C-alpha cells in the first residue's frame, strides 16, 4: 500500500470514528428548536469564522432554499457572515470582535436562534455573539470541538466533536448541519 492510500484509509477511519461520537439526543433537540422557530416565524441566525463561516452559509442555503422551497411553512434564516460589506464595515469602524454582535442587535428577539460555529470554541467574536444572544432571550447552539472552549460552556445547547483536527471537525460540522437541514427536506411531516 502506498503512502497516499494509507493516509486516505486513516483519514476515513478517523472520520468514521468521530461520527460515532455525535450525540443524537443533542442533535434532536436542535431539530426541535429549528422546528419551533419555523412554526413561530422566528429568525435563525448563524455565524462562524473562516471554514466555519462557509459551513454557516451552506446551512442557510440548505434551510432557506432546500427545506423551504415549495412548502407552506418556511424558515427565516440568515448567516451573519454573508454580507462582506457589513462584516468589514464593523471590523474597520468598530472592531473585529463586534462583527457578529452588532449585527445581532438588529435581529435579536426572544425565541430567535443563534447557531455559532467555532473550531476552537474561543473566538472572541463568536463568544460575544453568544453572550449577547443569551442575554437577549435567543436560544443558542454552539458547534465546536469536544474540548469546546468557552463556547461549549456558554451555549445553551452544544453540539461537539472530540477532535482538534480542523479537517475532521469541519467534516463533522457539515454532517451535523446536513442532518439539521435534511430532516426537514426529506421528511414531509416536518
Protein language model features and the residues they cover:
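Short, glycine/polar-rich helix-capping loops at beta-to-alpha or helix-loop-helix junctions
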Residues: 143-155
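Short glycine/serine/threonine-rich phosphate/pyrophosphate-binding segments
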Residues: 52-57, 122-129, 151
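Short beta->alpha connector loops at strand-helix junctions that form conserved
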Residues: 81, 118, 144, 159-167
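A short, well-structured juxtamembrane/interface segment
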Residues: 22-40
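Generic N-terminal amphipathic, Lys/Arg-enriched alpha-helix
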Residues: 1-21
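Glycine-rich, small/polar surface segments that engage phosphate groups of diverse ligands
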Residues: 36-108
Amino acid at each position: 500500500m502506498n503512502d497516499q492510500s494509507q493516509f486516505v484509509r486513516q483519514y476515513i477511519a478517523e472520520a468514521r470514528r468521530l461520527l460515532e461520537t455525535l450525540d443524537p439526543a443533542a442533535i434532536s433537540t436542535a431539530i426541535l428548536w429549528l422546528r419551533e422557530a419555523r412554526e413561530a416565524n422566528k429568525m435563525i441566525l448563524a455565524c462562524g469564522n473562516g471554514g466555519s463561516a462557509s459551513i454557516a452559509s451552506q446551512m442557510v442555503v440548505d434551510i432557506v432554499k432546500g427545506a423551504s422551497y415549495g412548502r407552506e411553512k418556511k424558515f427565516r434564516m440568515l448567516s451573519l457572515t454573508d454580507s462582506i460589506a457589513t462584516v468589514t464595515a464593523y471590523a474597520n469602524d468598530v472592531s473585529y470582535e463586534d462583527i457578529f454582535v452588532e449585527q445581532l442587535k438588529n435581529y435579536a428577539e426572544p425565541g430567535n436562534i443563534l447557531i455559532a460555529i467555532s473550531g476552537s470554541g474561543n473566538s472572541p467574536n463568536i463568544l460575544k455573539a453568544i453572550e449577547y444572544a443569551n442575554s437577549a432571550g435567543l436560544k443558542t447552539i454552539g458547534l465546536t470541538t469536544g474540548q469546546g472552549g468557552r463556547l461549549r460552556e456558554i451555549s445553551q445547547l452544544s453540539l461537539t466533536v472530540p477532535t482538534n483536527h480542523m479537517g475532521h471537525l469541519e467534516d463533522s460540522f457539515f454532517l451535523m448541519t446536513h442532518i439539521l437541514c435534511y430532516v426537514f427536506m426529506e421528511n414531509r411531516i416536518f
